[in-house]
Structure formats: structure tokens, C-alpha cells
């Protein structure tokens, strides 16, 4: 996957960034941490402008997240889970990941949308419960764009700054992703235990 993405960017430049980032905001199978850090690297070693990369990535993110948001507004939560159970394997999406994003959204609302924009996979999945639960589109868009703008600029700048250590950078990003998954799992277990404890006390 990584090699395909980097070769695609090397060959098609800005157009590749736009297509990949748009897809990344609709499907969680295209990792933006690879796309944008490599784009930052290419801004050093080619004619690509860091400002143009940032603008293109932000516009593509905006279009992609709104596409997914409006799709999810049209379907119920039950139908969504049934679809993921049947077809999720083709887009590397599991019901438990979606449930995690949904639980975060219902518990934290706007803050969940903002914070999840900095967490691989969940940064895409959080759009689904926002759409299904019909979160105000203006609020959703503003919060998402703030988080996405910070994420995009940070990764592009990181790739540009550490262009001489790209291999080490990719390893570090993979480690970050794994750590975030562990943190999320621990948080879910913690809140589940608290919820069960409260129900037992009520009984």
C-alpha cells in the first residue's frame, strides 16, 4: 500500500494528493499520515509547493468529509451496522471500530469530532455517527476543518522537515498509530467498566 501511494504521488503530483486525500476522508483504507508526509518530502525534492499541497489537501478533505457525512445522513444506524457486517471487509472496516466511534460521538459530541481528527482510522469513522445522528452541518464542518487543517499542515511540515529521514519517519507514524489504538481500547474498557458499575449500583 505504502509503495503504491508514494509512486502514485511521485507520478501525478497535486492531482494524486487531491484524489488520495478525498478518498481518505471517505474510506479509512488510505492513510493520510503516509500521503501527506510523503507530499511534504516531495516539496523538498521536486517542484511541489508546500502551500499548494496544503490548500489542495484541505479542499479535498472538505469535499471528502462532506460526501461521507451526507451519505450517512440518509441511512439509519441499524442499516449501517448491517452493511458493515456484510461488506466491511472490502474496505477494511469493522463494526467494533464503528461502534467505538459512535460511542465517542454520543458521549463527547463536538469534542469527539475534533479529537478524533488526530487519530488514524477514527478520524474518518467519526464522520459516520455525526451524519447518522444528524449533527448540525455547520458545526460539523467548522470543527472538522479546524482539526483537519492542523492535521494536514502538521504532516506536510513533518515530511518536509524530516525529508532526510523518511524511513524513520514512517516507522514513527506506524508506532503512533499502534499507540493510539491501545489508548482507545483502554479508554473503551474503562468507560464500559464504569457504566456496568453504575448499573449494578442502581439495581
From Swiss-Prot:
Keywords: Cell membrane, Cell wall biogenesis/degradation, Membrane, Transmembrane, Transmembrane helix, Transport
Gene ablation phenotype (knockout): Deletion of the gene does not affect sensitivity to the amphomycin derivative MX2401, which binds UndP in the outer leaflet of the cytoplasmic membrane and prevents its recycling. In another study, the deletion mutant exhibits moderate acid-dependent amphomycin sensitivity, but sensitivity to other antibiotics is unaltered at any pH. The double mutant uptA-popT is growth-impaired and exhibits cell size variability, and 10% of the cells have membrane permeability defects, consistent with impaired envelope assembly. The triple mutant lacking uptA, popT and SAOUHSC_00901 is not viable.
Segments passing through the bilayer: 16-36, 48-68, 108-128, 137-157, 173-193
Main localisation: membrane
InterPro entries: DedA_domain, VTT_dom
Pfam families in alphabetical order: VTT_dom
Cellular component GO terms held in the UniProt record: plasma membrane
Subcellular location: Cell membrane
Keyword Cell wall biogenesis/degradation: yes
One GO BP annotation of this record: cell wall organization
Membrane topology: Multi-pass membrane protein
Summary of the function given for this chain in its UniProt record: Flippase that catalyzes the transport of undecaprenyl phosphate (UndP) across the cytoplasmic membrane, from the external side to the cytoplasmic side. Is involved in UndP recycling during peptidoglycan synthesis.
PANTHER family, sorted: ALKALINE PHOSPHATASE LIKE PROTEIN (PTHR42709), UNDECAPRENYL PHOSPHATE TRANSPORTER A (PTHR42709:SF6)
Family of the protein in this entry: Belongs to the DedA family.
Protein name per its UniProtKB record: Undecaprenyl phosphate transporter A
Organism (species): Staphylococcus aureus (strain NCTC 8325 / PS 47)
Record lineage: Bacteria, Bacillati, Bacillota, Bacilli, Bacillales
Gene responsible for this protein: uptA
Amino acid at each position: 500500500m505504502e509503495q503504491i501511494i508514494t509512486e502514485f504521488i511521485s507520478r501525478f503530483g497535486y492531482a494524486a494528493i487531491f484524489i488520495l486525500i478525498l478518498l481518505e476522508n471517505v474510506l479509512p483504507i488510505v492513510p493520510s499520515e503516509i500521503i501527506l508526509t510523503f507530499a511534504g518530502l516531495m516539496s523538498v525534492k521536486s517542484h511541489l509547493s508546500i502551500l499548494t499541497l496544503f490548500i489542495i489537501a484541505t479542499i479535498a478533505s472538505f469535499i471528502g468529509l462532506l460526501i461521507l457525512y451526507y451519505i450517512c445522513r440518509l441511512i439509519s444506524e441499524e442499516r449501517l451496522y448491517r452493511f458493515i457486517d456484510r461488506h466491511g471487509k472490502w474496505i477494511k472496516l469493522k463494526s467494533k471500530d464503528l461502534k467505538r466511534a459512535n460511542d465517542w460521538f454520543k458521549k463527547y459530541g463536538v469534542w469527539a469530532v475534533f479529537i478524533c481528527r488526530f487519530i488514524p482510522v477514527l478520524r474518518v469513522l467519526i464522520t459516520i455517527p455525526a451524519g447518522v445522528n444528524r449533527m448540525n452541518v455547520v458545526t460539523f464542518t467548522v470543527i472538522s476543518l479546524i482539526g483537519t487543517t492542523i492535521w494536514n499542515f502538521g504532516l506536510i511540515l513533518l515530511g518536509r522537515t524530516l525529508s532526510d529521514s523518511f524511513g524513520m519517519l514512517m516507522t514513527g507514524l506506524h508506532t503512533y498509530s499502534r499507540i493510539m489504538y491501545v489508548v482507545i481500547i483502554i479508554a473503551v474498557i474503562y468507560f464500559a467498566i464504569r457504566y456496568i458499575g453504575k448499573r449494578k449500583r442502581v439495581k
